[in-house]
Amino acid sequence: MANIFFKLKLLCKSIIFLKNWYVFPIVYFRLTKKPFVHFRIKSGPNLKIRTGKGSSDIHVFAEIWLDNVYLREFNLKKNSTIIDIGSHIGLFSILASRKFDNGKVYSFEPDKYNFEILSDNIQFNKINNILPFNFAVSNSNNFIKLYCDENDFAAHSIHKKTLDSIDVQSITLKNIFYNNNIVRCDLLKLDCEGAEYEILMNTPKEIFQKIYKICMETDHFTDEKKLNEIINQLHDFNFKTIKKQISNNMGYLYAWK
């Protein structure tokens, strides 16, 4: 019953947010054979998303644009600096670029196909405050293996081994700050299929001193011990934290100071 109410809530929100809201249920329930659709946000961008096998774009769109999972706990200024790790096709980066239009968004996505659509979405909407990078983020500045999930283009991972893999350039969070001369990050968003642990646990305190808010998905953590280690480290670095379960399969950690 709760799942039905959740879907009805998303449909109602799609009517509020989308000019072509009628496309949302068609894609959500996989009733179209078109490989792509464009969602036209009211007073906002057009967003290209995939609809076929292997695409969870519609669910990512619902989480980010309709349910506002990454920004719901925070108030940020218009000139905020955002780092988006695991930017997929750019849905959060574009939302952040519009809400904080005097700021800057550093967007990192390792998969070439996802990155192409991210770039299309940026160029089509003539957005100039997103800096996209076709990089993975990990504890390495070298090439690493990205394991591909043929059933979900949003679930490629450097940890969950599959038969299909590609070599991708990686960068550490520390080097993101140094290479881009970032002196302050108002929000660090992470959705990188389990790489959150090695990214955060290998980032020095001097970098955390420049970060003021963090939001990350927690559903990838089958080992609760690792998530607790992250939380304890954030507490050591003067962050307050809260875990929230948004739905049965959507959990998030919010941190701020």
What residue spans do the PLM features occupy?
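Phosphate/nucleotide-binding beta-alpha loop and adjacent structural elements of enzyme active sites
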Residues: 1-257
